[in-house]
Every structure is written in C-alpha cells, then in structure tokens.
Regions:
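Nucleotide-activated chemistry modules centered on ATP-dependent adenylation/adenylyltransferase
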Residues: 1-126
Length: 126
C-alpha cells in the first residue's frame, strides 16, 4: 500500500510532519510528492503526461487527515497546534491563482477539506 500523499510506500517516513510539509507545498505551488513522482516517471519513460495528470488529480493534494495511520490531530498536538489553527494557516497560504475560491477570495474546501485546482495541467485555459 502506498503512503498517503505518495505513489510509493517507502518515501518520507522519517517523521510525521512530512505530510504536512508536502500539503503546504501543494497549497502554495499546486503540486506535491505525487506530482514529483509522476514527473520522475515521465522523464524515465514509464508514464505519459496524460496518465500523470489523471493520477495527480485523483491522488494528489488530499487533505492530510492521517499519515502512516496517525491522525492529523495527534501530529498537530506534537507541535502544539489545533486543527482549527492548521486550517486557518492553510487558508492563509493557499494560492488563489491555483485553487477555486469564493467571492471573498477564500479557498473553497469540499466536505473532506480538499481543494479543487482551477486547472490541473497548469496550461492556461483558452
């Protein structure tokens, strides 16, 4: 089974905060470890761009509610942060040029606290 937020089962296992780090990378820049792995597979000829976009859309950027079977609440407790505060920080650093936002410019989270990118292939819509 793959590690949450990754395509493999052996990467980023050194501490539980790695998943939070990868999630903030997604919020700020629109890509995460899954995208990194897809790019590596494309460069090695193991996957094409269309497959990569599909995988990144399905598996990438998911809210880090658990990591390695540990709840986000427990991970955040270790750094003295509540999930409410974590969500505030997420909203503050979410790039509105990459993710769908409401009329006030606030990111729109679904019922699972996931965001929707405006464009998954990072090519401007015509």
């Amino acid at each position: 089974k793959n590690v949450e937020g990754n395509l493999v089962n052996y990467e980023n296992l050194d501490n539980l905060q790695m998943r939070i780090h990868d999630y903030f990378k997604f919020l700020k820049y629109g890509y995460d470890r899954i995208t990194d792995w897809c790019c590596w597979h494309i460069r090695r000829g193991r996957m094409n761009r269309e497959e990569s976009i599909k995988i990144a859309k399905e598996k990438g950027g998911k809210y880090p509610s658990t990591y390695l079977k540990v709840s986000l609440e427990k991970i955040l407790n270790e750094i003295n942060c509540s999930e409410e505060k974590f969500l505030e920080i997420c909203k503050k650093f979410t790039n509105p040029q990459i993710f769908r936002c409401d009329n006030q410019g606030q990111p729109i989270f679904d019922k699972n606290k996931n965001l929707e990118k405006i464009n998954y292939d990072n090519i401007s819509e015509k």
